[in-house]
Design a protein with these regions (language model features):
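Boundary detector for helix-to-coil junctions that initiate low-complexity/charged tails
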Residues: 1-69
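C-terminal amphipathic helix plus adjacent low-complexity
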Residues: 37, 41-44, 51, 58, ...
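Catalytic core of nucleotide-activated saccharide and alditol-phosphate transferases
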Residues: 66-82, 171-276, 407-408, 413, ...
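Extended catalytic core of nucleotide-activated donor transferases of GT-like folds
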Residues: 78-218, 337-338, 362, 366, ...
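Catalytic binding pocket for nucleotide-activated donors in carbohydrate/polymer assembly enzymes
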Residues: 113, 196, 220, 299-316, ...
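Conserved catalytic core of nucleotide-sugar-dependent glycosyltransferases
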Residues: 207, 484-550
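Conserved catalytic-core segment of nucleotide-activated headgroup transferases in glycan assembly
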Residues: 232-233, 237-325, 435-453
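Short beta-strand-to-loop acidic/aromatic patch adjacent to the donor-nucleotide binding site
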Residues: 468-488, 492
Protein backbone atom coordinates (compact mmCIF):
# COMPACT_ATOMS: atom_id res chain seq x y z
CA UNK A 1 0.00 0.00 0.00
CA UNK A 2 1.40 3.33 -1.00
CA UNK A 3 2.27 5.99 1.59
CA UNK A 4 -0.55 8.27 0.40
CA UNK A 5 -3.09 5.48 0.81
CA UNK A 6 -1.84 4.70 4.32
CA UNK A 7 -2.14 8.35 5.34
CA UNK A 8 -5.63 8.53 3.88
CA UNK A 9 -6.65 5.40 5.77
CA UNK A 10 -5.23 6.82 9.02
CA UNK A 11 -7.22 9.99 8.46
CA UNK A 12 -10.39 8.00 7.82
CA UNK A 13 -9.88 5.90 10.95
CA UNK A 14 -9.27 8.99 13.08
CA UNK A 15 -12.53 10.42 11.80
CA UNK A 16 -14.35 7.17 12.55
CA UNK A 17 -12.92 7.15 16.09
CA UNK A 18 -13.87 10.78 16.61
CA UNK A 19 -17.43 10.08 15.50
CA UNK A 20 -17.56 6.95 17.67
CA UNK A 21 -16.35 8.89 20.72
CA UNK A 22 -18.92 11.60 20.06
CA UNK A 23 -21.60 8.95 19.69
CA UNK A 24 -20.64 7.37 22.98
CA UNK A 25 -20.81 10.73 24.75
CA UNK A 26 -24.20 11.38 23.15
CA UNK A 27 -25.48 7.94 24.15
CA UNK A 28 -24.37 8.47 27.75
CA UNK A 29 -26.01 11.90 27.78
CA UNK A 30 -29.28 10.51 26.43
CA UNK A 31 -29.13 7.70 28.97
CA UNK A 32 -28.73 10.15 31.83
CA UNK A 33 -31.36 12.50 30.40
CA UNK A 34 -33.90 9.66 30.34
CA UNK A 35 -33.51 9.33 34.12
CA UNK A 36 -34.15 12.99 34.94
CA UNK A 37 -37.34 14.61 36.26
CA UNK A 38 -37.43 16.55 32.99
CA UNK A 39 -37.83 13.32 30.99
CA UNK A 40 -40.36 11.88 33.44
CA UNK A 41 -42.42 15.05 33.06
CA UNK A 42 -42.41 14.55 29.31
CA UNK A 43 -43.57 10.92 29.61
CA UNK A 44 -46.43 11.92 31.91
CA UNK A 45 -47.48 14.83 29.72
CA UNK A 46 -46.42 17.51 32.21
CA UNK A 47 -43.54 19.01 30.24
CA UNK A 48 -42.07 19.21 26.75
CA UNK A 49 -39.58 16.84 25.18
CA UNK A 50 -36.00 18.04 25.08
CA UNK A 51 -34.48 16.98 21.79
CA UNK A 52 -30.79 16.09 21.48
CA UNK A 53 -28.69 19.25 21.43
CA UNK A 54 -25.82 19.59 18.99
CA UNK A 55 -25.59 23.27 18.08
CA UNK A 56 -26.00 26.54 19.91
CA UNK A 57 -29.33 27.20 18.19
CA UNK A 58 -30.62 23.84 19.47
CA UNK A 59 -29.54 24.84 22.98
CA UNK A 60 -31.41 28.14 22.85
CA UNK A 61 -34.46 26.55 21.23
CA UNK A 62 -34.81 23.91 23.94
CA UNK A 63 -34.09 26.45 26.68
CA UNK A 64 -36.97 28.60 25.42
CA UNK A 65 -39.41 25.83 26.39
CA UNK A 66 -38.55 26.35 30.05
CA UNK A 67 -37.47 29.99 30.16
CA UNK A 68 -40.78 31.50 31.23
CA UNK A 69 -41.44 29.10 34.11
CA UNK A 70 -37.89 29.34 35.44
CA UNK A 71 -37.88 33.13 35.21
CA UNK A 72 -41.19 33.26 37.08
CA UNK A 73 -39.91 31.04 39.88
CA UNK A 74 -36.72 33.06 40.21
CA UNK A 75 -38.63 36.33 40.22
CA UNK A 76 -40.67 35.16 43.21
CA UNK A 77 -37.45 34.40 45.06
CA UNK A 78 -35.99 37.78 44.10
CA UNK A 79 -39.06 39.60 45.44
CA UNK A 80 -38.65 37.75 48.73
CA UNK A 81 -34.91 38.46 48.78
CA UNK A 82 -35.50 42.17 48.25
CA UNK A 83 -36.91 42.37 51.79
CA UNK A 84 -33.78 41.03 53.47
CA UNK A 85 -32.20 43.39 56.04
CA UNK A 86 -28.96 45.15 55.17
CA UNK A 87 -25.88 45.51 57.35
CA UNK A 88 -24.83 49.11 57.86
CA UNK A 89 -22.48 48.94 60.86
CA UNK A 90 -20.49 46.62 63.11
CA UNK A 91 -18.96 47.23 66.52
CA UNK A 92 -15.83 45.13 66.75
CA UNK A 93 -13.41 46.60 64.21
CA UNK A 94 -12.44 50.20 63.51
CA UNK A 95 -11.66 51.31 59.99
CA UNK A 96 -7.90 51.40 59.49
CA UNK A 97 -6.49 54.88 58.97
CA UNK A 98 -3.98 53.82 56.33
CA UNK A 99 -4.46 55.03 52.77
CA UNK A 100 -4.02 52.16 50.34
CA UNK A 101 -3.54 52.74 46.64
CA UNK A 102 -5.03 49.79 44.80
CA UNK A 103 -5.03 48.26 41.33
CA UNK A 104 -7.62 45.47 41.31
CA UNK A 105 -10.77 44.08 39.78
CA UNK A 106 -14.09 45.08 41.29
CA UNK A 107 -14.86 41.94 43.30
CA UNK A 108 -11.54 41.96 45.12
CA UNK A 109 -11.73 45.71 45.69
CA UNK A 110 -15.24 45.47 47.13
CA UNK A 111 -14.24 42.62 49.41
CA UNK A 112 -11.62 44.84 51.11
CA UNK A 113 -12.79 48.44 50.81
CA UNK A 114 -14.70 48.55 54.10
CA UNK A 115 -11.52 48.02 56.15
CA UNK A 116 -9.38 51.03 55.14
CA UNK A 117 -9.21 54.12 52.95
CA UNK A 118 -8.64 52.70 49.47
CA UNK A 119 -7.65 54.94 46.56
CA UNK A 120 -8.10 53.33 43.11
CA UNK A 121 -5.03 53.90 40.93
CA UNK A 122 -5.50 54.37 37.18
CA UNK A 123 -3.17 55.03 34.24
CA UNK A 124 -4.41 58.63 34.34
CA UNK A 125 -4.31 59.52 38.07
CA UNK A 126 -1.27 57.68 39.44
CA UNK A 127 1.05 60.71 39.63
CA UNK A 128 -1.44 62.66 41.75
CA UNK A 129 -2.91 59.76 43.73
CA UNK A 130 0.08 57.64 44.73
CA UNK A 131 1.88 60.35 46.79
CA UNK A 132 -1.27 60.46 48.98
CA UNK A 133 -0.99 56.77 49.88
CA UNK A 134 0.87 54.77 52.53
CA UNK A 135 1.19 51.63 50.39
CA UNK A 136 0.43 50.52 46.83
CA UNK A 137 -1.42 47.21 46.54
CA UNK A 138 -1.13 45.71 43.05
CA UNK A 139 -3.50 42.78 42.55
CA UNK A 140 -3.49 40.35 39.63
CA UNK A 141 -6.29 42.12 37.77
CA UNK A 142 -7.97 41.34 34.47
CA UNK A 143 -9.86 44.57 33.79
CA UNK A 144 -9.75 46.92 36.79
CA UNK A 145 -12.68 48.68 38.41
CA UNK A 146 -13.90 50.42 35.26
CA UNK A 147 -12.01 48.74 32.41
CA UNK A 148 -8.97 50.96 33.06
CA UNK A 149 -6.64 47.95 33.32
CA UNK A 150 -7.86 45.87 30.39
CA UNK A 151 -5.01 43.72 28.98
CA UNK A 152 -2.93 43.98 32.15
CA UNK A 153 -2.34 40.17 32.16
CA UNK A 154 -0.71 40.40 28.72
CA UNK A 155 3.01 40.78 29.38
CA UNK A 156 3.54 42.81 26.20
CA UNK A 157 0.58 45.17 26.61
CA UNK A 158 0.94 48.91 27.04
CA UNK A 159 -0.84 48.78 30.42
CA UNK A 160 1.60 46.18 31.69
CA UNK A 161 4.58 48.21 30.54
CA UNK A 162 3.15 51.34 32.17
CA UNK A 163 2.70 49.53 35.47
CA UNK A 164 6.08 47.82 35.57
CA UNK A 165 8.30 50.49 34.04
CA UNK A 166 6.63 53.67 35.26
CA UNK A 167 4.06 53.32 38.06
CA UNK A 168 5.92 50.90 40.35
CA UNK A 169 9.28 52.74 40.02
CA UNK A 170 7.45 56.05 40.60
CA UNK A 171 5.88 54.62 43.77
CA UNK A 172 9.22 53.43 45.12
CA UNK A 173 10.80 56.79 44.35
CA UNK A 174 8.21 58.31 46.70
CA UNK A 175 9.35 55.95 49.47
CA UNK A 176 6.03 54.09 49.33
CA UNK A 177 6.15 50.28 49.63
CA UNK A 178 4.63 48.10 46.91
CA UNK A 179 2.70 44.94 47.76
CA UNK A 180 1.78 42.45 45.05
CA UNK A 181 -1.11 40.02 45.58
CA UNK A 182 -1.76 37.26 43.06
CA UNK A 183 -5.26 35.91 43.53
CA UNK A 184 -4.83 33.86 40.33
CA UNK A 185 -2.32 31.28 41.54
CA UNK A 186 -1.69 28.57 40.59
CA UNK A 187 -3.44 28.52 37.16
CA UNK A 188 -2.32 31.98 36.04
CA UNK A 189 1.01 32.20 37.82
CA UNK A 190 3.04 32.85 34.67
CA UNK A 191 0.78 35.71 33.58
CA UNK A 192 1.59 37.86 36.60
CA UNK A 193 4.90 36.70 38.10
CA UNK A 194 6.90 39.58 36.58
CA UNK A 195 4.92 41.99 38.79
CA UNK A 196 6.03 40.04 41.85
CA UNK A 197 9.68 40.63 40.95
CA UNK A 198 9.17 44.38 41.44
CA UNK A 199 7.31 44.28 44.77
CA UNK A 200 8.54 44.76 48.33
CA UNK A 201 6.23 42.02 49.60
CA UNK A 202 4.33 39.29 47.76
CA UNK A 203 1.10 37.53 48.68
CA UNK A 204 -0.29 34.54 46.82
CA UNK A 205 -3.66 32.84 46.89
CA UNK A 206 -1.93 29.42 46.81
CA UNK A 207 0.75 28.63 49.36
CA UNK A 208 1.86 25.69 47.19
CA UNK A 209 3.45 28.06 44.65
CA UNK A 210 5.67 29.82 47.21
CA UNK A 211 8.67 27.63 46.22
CA UNK A 212 8.21 28.79 42.62
CA UNK A 213 8.27 32.42 43.73
CA UNK A 214 11.46 31.72 45.69
CA UNK A 215 13.10 30.64 42.44
CA UNK A 216 11.58 33.30 40.19
CA UNK A 217 11.86 36.53 42.20
CA UNK A 218 14.85 38.23 43.86
CA UNK A 219 16.07 36.97 47.22
CA UNK A 220 14.83 39.00 50.13
CA UNK A 221 11.28 39.60 48.87
CA UNK A 222 8.99 37.92 51.43
CA UNK A 223 6.22 35.67 50.05
CA UNK A 224 3.18 34.66 52.09
CA UNK A 225 -0.23 33.10 51.41
CA UNK A 226 -3.32 35.30 51.66
CA UNK A 227 -6.85 33.93 51.48
CA UNK A 228 -9.96 35.79 50.39
CA UNK A 229 -11.92 37.84 52.92
CA UNK A 230 -15.45 39.22 53.21
CA UNK A 231 -16.89 42.70 53.48
CA UNK A 232 -19.61 42.50 56.15
CA UNK A 233 -21.75 45.09 54.37
CA UNK A 234 -22.02 42.80 51.34
CA UNK A 235 -21.74 39.33 52.85
CA UNK A 236 -23.53 38.84 56.17
CA UNK A 237 -26.17 36.47 57.59
CA UNK A 238 -28.88 39.03 58.37
CA UNK A 239 -32.20 37.49 57.36
CA UNK A 240 -30.54 34.22 56.37
CA UNK A 241 -32.93 31.96 58.31
CA UNK A 242 -36.20 33.34 56.95
CA UNK A 243 -36.56 31.08 53.95
CA UNK A 244 -37.23 27.40 54.60
CA UNK A 245 -37.31 26.23 50.97
CA UNK A 246 -34.66 23.95 49.51
CA UNK A 247 -34.26 25.63 46.12
CA UNK A 248 -30.72 25.66 44.78
CA UNK A 249 -29.39 28.42 42.53
CA UNK A 250 -26.00 28.01 40.92
CA UNK A 251 -24.47 30.86 38.93
CA UNK A 252 -21.53 29.95 36.76
CA UNK A 253 -20.16 28.78 33.45
CA UNK A 254 -19.73 25.42 31.77
CA UNK A 255 -16.05 25.10 30.86
CA UNK A 256 -15.33 21.40 30.55
CA UNK A 257 -12.66 22.16 27.94
CA UNK A 258 -10.66 24.08 30.55
CA UNK A 259 -11.68 22.47 33.85
CA UNK A 260 -12.72 18.85 33.15
CA UNK A 261 -12.58 17.76 36.81
CA UNK A 262 -14.78 20.64 37.88
CA UNK A 263 -17.23 19.82 35.06
CA UNK A 264 -17.42 16.20 36.19
CA UNK A 265 -18.17 17.35 39.76
CA UNK A 266 -20.84 19.70 38.45
CA UNK A 267 -22.65 16.89 36.69
CA UNK A 268 -22.55 14.65 39.76
CA UNK A 269 -23.91 17.30 42.10
CA UNK A 270 -26.58 18.59 39.72
CA UNK A 271 -27.75 15.04 39.00
CA UNK A 272 -27.83 14.28 42.71
CA UNK A 273 -29.91 17.37 43.48
CA UNK A 274 -32.40 16.55 40.74
CA UNK A 275 -32.68 12.94 41.89
CA UNK A 276 -33.36 14.24 45.40
CA UNK A 277 -36.23 16.28 43.98
CA UNK A 278 -34.82 19.73 44.73
CA UNK A 279 -35.65 22.70 42.48
CA UNK A 280 -32.41 23.58 40.66
CA UNK A 281 -31.82 26.81 38.74
CA UNK A 282 -28.60 27.22 36.79
CA UNK A 283 -27.81 30.84 35.99
CA UNK A 284 -25.74 30.35 32.83
CA UNK A 285 -23.36 33.29 32.58
CA UNK A 286 -22.62 32.48 28.94
CA UNK A 287 -26.19 32.07 27.76
CA UNK A 288 -26.39 35.52 26.20
CA UNK A 289 -22.97 35.59 24.54
CA UNK A 290 -23.03 37.05 21.05
CA UNK A 291 -21.92 34.46 18.43
CA UNK A 292 -20.56 37.33 16.35
CA UNK A 293 -18.04 38.10 19.10
CA UNK A 294 -17.29 34.58 20.38
CA UNK A 295 -16.38 31.47 18.41
CA UNK A 296 -17.42 27.90 19.15
CA UNK A 297 -20.06 28.74 21.74
CA UNK A 298 -21.03 25.07 21.89
CA UNK A 299 -18.16 24.47 24.32
CA UNK A 300 -19.94 26.70 26.86
CA UNK A 301 -23.20 24.73 26.78
CA UNK A 302 -24.26 22.85 29.90
CA UNK A 303 -25.16 19.19 29.22
CA UNK A 304 -28.58 19.04 27.59
CA UNK A 305 -30.21 17.24 30.52
CA UNK A 306 -29.82 20.49 32.51
CA UNK A 307 -31.40 22.73 29.87
CA UNK A 308 -34.70 22.58 31.76
CA UNK A 309 -32.95 24.22 34.73
CA UNK A 310 -31.29 27.11 32.92
CA UNK A 311 -31.82 30.79 33.58
CA UNK A 312 -30.39 33.81 31.83
CA UNK A 313 -27.57 35.78 33.52
CA UNK A 314 -28.53 37.96 36.47
CA UNK A 315 -26.95 41.17 37.79
CA UNK A 316 -24.45 40.51 40.56
CA UNK A 317 -26.50 42.32 43.21
CA UNK A 318 -29.53 40.13 42.47
CA UNK A 319 -27.42 37.00 42.72
CA UNK A 320 -26.10 38.16 46.09
CA UNK A 321 -29.61 38.61 47.43
CA UNK A 322 -30.68 35.20 46.16
CA UNK A 323 -27.66 33.50 47.68
CA UNK A 324 -28.34 35.17 51.02
CA UNK A 325 -32.01 34.15 50.95
CA UNK A 326 -31.49 30.49 50.13
CA UNK A 327 -30.09 28.20 52.84
CA UNK A 328 -28.37 25.82 50.39
CA UNK A 329 -25.85 26.39 47.62
CA UNK A 330 -23.41 24.54 45.40
CA UNK A 331 -19.76 25.47 45.15
CA UNK A 332 -17.43 24.17 42.43
CA UNK A 333 -13.67 24.50 42.90
CA UNK A 334 -11.36 24.52 39.89
CA UNK A 335 -8.24 24.18 42.05
CA UNK A 336 -8.61 21.17 44.34
CA UNK A 337 -5.18 20.50 45.84
CA UNK A 338 -4.41 23.85 47.47
CA UNK A 339 -4.72 24.59 51.18
CA UNK A 340 -5.33 28.31 50.56
CA UNK A 341 -6.69 28.70 47.01
CA UNK A 342 -10.37 27.88 46.59
CA UNK A 343 -13.38 29.66 45.18
CA UNK A 344 -14.01 32.99 46.91
CA UNK A 345 -17.70 32.12 47.00
CA UNK A 346 -16.83 29.64 49.78
CA UNK A 347 -16.21 32.36 52.37
CA UNK A 348 -18.87 34.63 50.86
CA UNK A 349 -21.63 32.02 51.07
CA UNK A 350 -20.63 30.82 54.53
CA UNK A 351 -20.71 34.44 55.73
CA UNK A 352 -24.28 34.70 54.46
CA UNK A 353 -25.41 31.71 56.49
CA UNK A 354 -25.39 29.13 53.71
CA UNK A 355 -24.92 25.39 54.01
CA UNK A 356 -22.43 24.83 51.24
CA UNK A 357 -22.30 21.66 49.15
CA UNK A 358 -18.97 21.48 47.36
CA UNK A 359 -16.63 19.30 45.38
CA UNK A 360 -13.33 18.48 47.03
CA UNK A 361 -10.83 21.16 47.95
CA UNK A 362 -7.97 20.48 50.33
CA UNK A 363 -8.28 23.94 51.89
CA UNK A 364 -12.06 23.86 52.24
CA UNK A 365 -11.92 20.37 53.72
CA UNK A 366 -9.32 21.52 56.28
CA UNK A 367 -10.71 24.91 57.26
CA UNK A 368 -14.47 24.64 56.98
CA UNK A 369 -15.77 21.35 58.40
CA UNK A 370 -19.40 22.46 58.03
CA UNK A 371 -19.07 22.37 54.22
CA UNK A 372 -20.52 19.14 52.82
CA UNK A 373 -17.92 17.65 50.48
CA UNK A 374 -19.54 15.48 47.80
CA UNK A 375 -17.72 12.93 45.67
CA UNK A 376 -20.53 11.21 43.77
CA UNK A 377 -24.04 11.73 42.50
CA UNK A 378 -25.32 9.29 45.12
CA UNK A 379 -23.52 11.19 47.91
CA UNK A 380 -25.29 14.37 46.87
CA UNK A 381 -28.68 12.72 46.49
CA UNK A 382 -28.58 10.97 49.86
CA UNK A 383 -27.23 14.01 51.70
CA UNK A 384 -30.01 16.23 50.38
CA UNK A 385 -32.73 13.63 50.94
CA UNK A 386 -31.73 13.11 54.58
CA UNK A 387 -30.82 16.70 55.46
CA UNK A 388 -32.80 17.78 58.53
CA UNK A 389 -33.70 21.35 59.42
CA UNK A 390 -31.70 21.02 62.64
CA UNK A 391 -28.51 19.93 60.88
CA UNK A 392 -29.00 22.64 58.28
CA UNK A 393 -29.19 25.28 61.03
CA UNK A 394 -26.16 23.81 62.79
CA UNK A 395 -24.05 24.05 59.63
CA UNK A 396 -25.24 27.61 58.99
CA UNK A 397 -24.16 28.66 62.48
CA UNK A 398 -20.78 26.93 62.15
CA UNK A 399 -20.01 28.66 58.85
CA UNK A 400 -21.00 32.13 60.05
CA UNK A 401 -18.76 31.83 63.10
CA UNK A 402 -15.73 30.51 61.23
CA UNK A 403 -15.74 33.25 58.60
CA UNK A 404 -16.40 36.17 60.93
CA UNK A 405 -13.71 35.10 63.37
CA UNK A 406 -10.98 34.59 60.77
CA UNK A 407 -11.89 35.75 57.26
CA UNK A 408 -13.02 39.37 57.30
CA UNK A 409 -11.69 42.27 55.26
CA UNK A 410 -10.08 43.61 58.44
CA UNK A 411 -8.10 40.39 58.90
CA UNK A 412 -6.79 40.58 55.35
CA UNK A 413 -6.03 44.31 55.33
CA UNK A 414 -4.18 44.05 58.65
CA UNK A 415 -1.95 41.34 57.21
CA UNK A 416 -1.21 43.44 54.13
CA UNK A 417 -0.39 46.56 56.14
CA UNK A 418 1.66 44.74 58.77
CA UNK A 419 3.75 43.12 56.03
CA UNK A 420 5.29 46.49 55.16
CA UNK A 421 5.60 47.76 58.72
CA UNK A 422 2.35 49.71 59.00
CA UNK A 423 0.78 49.11 62.40
CA UNK A 424 -2.94 48.48 62.82
CA UNK A 425 -5.23 48.73 65.87
CA UNK A 426 -5.74 45.60 67.94
CA UNK A 427 -9.49 46.26 68.37
CA UNK A 428 -9.33 45.40 72.05
CA UNK A 429 -12.65 45.11 73.82
CA UNK A 430 -13.28 43.74 77.26
CA UNK A 431 -15.44 40.63 77.44
CA UNK A 432 -17.19 40.76 80.80
CA UNK A 433 -19.03 37.64 81.97
CA UNK A 434 -21.74 38.08 84.59
CA UNK A 435 -22.27 34.99 86.74
CA UNK A 436 -23.95 34.20 90.04
CA UNK A 437 -20.71 32.87 91.51
CA UNK A 438 -17.03 32.33 90.81
CA UNK A 439 -17.79 28.64 90.35
CA UNK A 440 -20.45 29.37 87.72
CA UNK A 441 -18.05 31.70 85.89
CA UNK A 442 -15.32 29.05 85.88
CA UNK A 443 -17.76 26.44 84.62
CA UNK A 444 -18.74 28.76 81.78
CA UNK A 445 -15.13 29.67 80.98
CA UNK A 446 -13.97 26.05 80.91
CA UNK A 447 -16.75 25.17 78.48
CA UNK A 448 -15.61 27.73 75.91
CA UNK A 449 -13.60 26.82 72.81
CA UNK A 450 -12.35 30.39 72.60
CA UNK A 451 -9.04 32.23 72.77
CA UNK A 452 -10.66 35.47 73.95
CA UNK A 453 -9.93 36.50 77.51
CA UNK A 454 -12.93 37.19 79.70
CA UNK A 455 -13.38 38.80 83.10
CA UNK A 456 -15.70 37.67 85.90
CA UNK A 457 -18.32 40.10 87.16
CA UNK A 458 -20.53 39.00 90.10
CA UNK A 459 -24.22 39.37 89.26
CA UNK A 460 -24.59 41.71 92.22
CA UNK A 461 -22.24 44.19 90.50
CA UNK A 462 -23.68 43.97 86.97
CA UNK A 463 -25.58 47.23 87.35
CA UNK A 464 -22.30 49.06 87.99
CA UNK A 465 -20.52 48.01 84.78
CA UNK A 466 -19.46 50.91 82.58
CA UNK A 467 -18.14 50.64 79.05
CA UNK A 468 -14.44 51.32 78.50
CA UNK A 469 -12.90 53.51 75.80
CA UNK A 470 -13.50 51.25 72.79
CA UNK A 471 -16.70 49.56 73.93
CA UNK A 472 -17.23 46.23 75.67
CA UNK A 473 -19.14 42.98 75.30
CA UNK A 474 -21.08 41.88 78.38
CA UNK A 475 -22.35 38.29 78.52
CA UNK A 476 -24.78 37.13 81.21
CA UNK A 477 -23.80 33.51 81.78
CA UNK A 478 -26.57 33.20 84.36
CA UNK A 479 -29.17 33.79 81.63
CA UNK A 480 -27.94 31.16 79.18
CA UNK A 481 -29.93 28.03 78.36
CA UNK A 482 -26.69 26.03 78.35
CA UNK A 483 -22.94 26.64 78.42
CA UNK A 484 -22.27 25.75 74.80
CA UNK A 485 -18.63 25.86 73.65
CA UNK A 486 -19.05 28.76 71.24
CA UNK A 487 -21.01 31.36 73.21
CA UNK A 488 -18.15 33.87 73.28
CA UNK A 489 -17.05 33.19 69.71
CA UNK A 490 -20.57 33.52 68.34
CA UNK A 491 -21.14 36.78 70.21
CA UNK A 492 -17.85 38.25 68.97
CA UNK A 493 -18.61 37.10 65.42
CA UNK A 494 -22.03 38.78 65.59
CA UNK A 495 -20.44 42.12 66.43
CA UNK A 496 -18.14 41.82 63.39
CA UNK A 497 -21.16 42.04 61.04
CA UNK A 498 -23.76 43.91 63.10
CA UNK A 499 -24.18 46.42 65.90
CA UNK A 500 -27.22 45.62 68.07
CA UNK A 501 -27.38 46.97 71.60
CA UNK A 502 -28.44 43.54 72.86
CA UNK A 503 -28.09 39.91 71.76
CA UNK A 504 -30.20 36.89 72.58
CA UNK A 505 -28.11 33.71 72.20
CA UNK A 506 -30.08 30.53 71.69
CA UNK A 507 -29.60 26.91 70.60
CA UNK A 508 -29.09 26.13 66.92
CA UNK A 509 -32.22 23.93 66.94
CA UNK A 510 -34.48 26.36 68.78
CA UNK A 511 -37.64 27.76 67.20
CA UNK A 512 -36.52 31.34 67.82
CA UNK A 513 -36.41 33.73 64.88
CA UNK A 514 -32.72 34.48 64.38
CA UNK A 515 -30.46 36.96 62.55
CA UNK A 516 -33.27 39.51 62.32
CA UNK A 517 -32.32 42.99 63.62
CA UNK A 518 -35.18 44.41 65.69
CA UNK A 519 -35.75 48.01 66.77
CA UNK A 520 -37.35 49.04 70.07
CA UNK A 521 -38.96 52.36 70.96
CA UNK A 522 -39.20 51.65 74.69
CA UNK A 523 -36.37 49.26 75.43
CA UNK A 524 -36.73 45.49 75.87
CA UNK A 525 -38.97 43.69 78.34
CA UNK A 526 -37.07 40.38 78.27
CA UNK A 527 -33.47 40.67 79.55
CA UNK A 528 -30.94 39.76 76.88
CA UNK A 529 -28.07 37.29 76.98
CA UNK A 530 -25.40 39.79 75.92
CA UNK A 531 -25.03 43.55 75.50
CA UNK A 532 -22.70 45.96 73.78
CA UNK A 533 -21.88 49.01 75.90
CA UNK A 534 -19.95 51.95 74.51
CA UNK A 535 -17.59 54.11 76.55
CA UNK A 536 -19.29 55.27 79.75
CA UNK A 537 -22.53 53.38 79.05
CA UNK A 538 -24.19 50.89 81.39
CA UNK A 539 -26.35 47.82 80.84
CA UNK A 540 -29.91 49.09 80.84
CA UNK A 541 -32.80 47.21 79.21
CA UNK A 542 -34.84 50.41 79.14
CA UNK A 543 -32.39 52.12 76.76
CA UNK A 544 -31.89 49.23 74.32
CA UNK A 545 -32.83 50.46 70.85
CA UNK A 546 -31.81 47.45 68.76
CA UNK A 547 -31.57 43.74 69.46
CA UNK A 548 -31.00 40.51 67.57
CA UNK A 549 -31.19 36.80 68.27
CA UNK A 550 -28.31 34.60 67.11
CA UNK A 551 -27.85 30.86 67.32
CA UNK A 552 -24.96 28.93 68.82
CA UNK A 553 -23.67 25.37 68.62
CA UNK A 554 -25.44 23.97 71.69
CA UNK A 555 -28.74 22.11 71.43
CA UNK A 556 -32.02 22.82 73.16
CA UNK A 557 -32.10 19.15 74.18
CA UNK A 558 -29.32 19.60 76.76
Amino acid sequence: MRKEEIQAEHKRLRKVKKNADAGQVRAESIGKSSQTPMFRNYLTGVGPLVKPIIKRNDYLREFSKFEKDNASAMQKLLVEAEELPKATAQNWNTKREAKIGIIADRFLYESLEVAADFIPITPENFREAIPQTDVLLVVSAWRGLNEEWVNLPRRTSGKRELLEKTIIPFTKDQGIPVVFYSKEDPPNYESFVSMARLADHVFTSAEEVIPKYRKDIPDGIPVEPLRFGVNYKIHNPLGSMRHMGREMVFAGSWMSHKYPSRAASTEKMFDGALRAGLPLYVVDRNLDLDPKSFKNLEKYMFPDRFVANLHRPLPHDELLRLQKLLPLAFNLNSVMGSQTMFANRVVELLAMGTLLISNYSAGVNTRYPSVAIMDTELDTQQFLETLSDDYLRYCQVEGIREVFLHDTAFDRVDKILNSVGISTPTDDHRILVVANSQAEFEQFQQAQASDFECTYVPSSEASNIKGSEHGDLVIFANRLEAFGPDIINDAVAAYRYSAPDALYITAFDSEAEAYEPTTHDNGISKPATAYWINAGEMVDDATVETSMTIKSSFTSNN
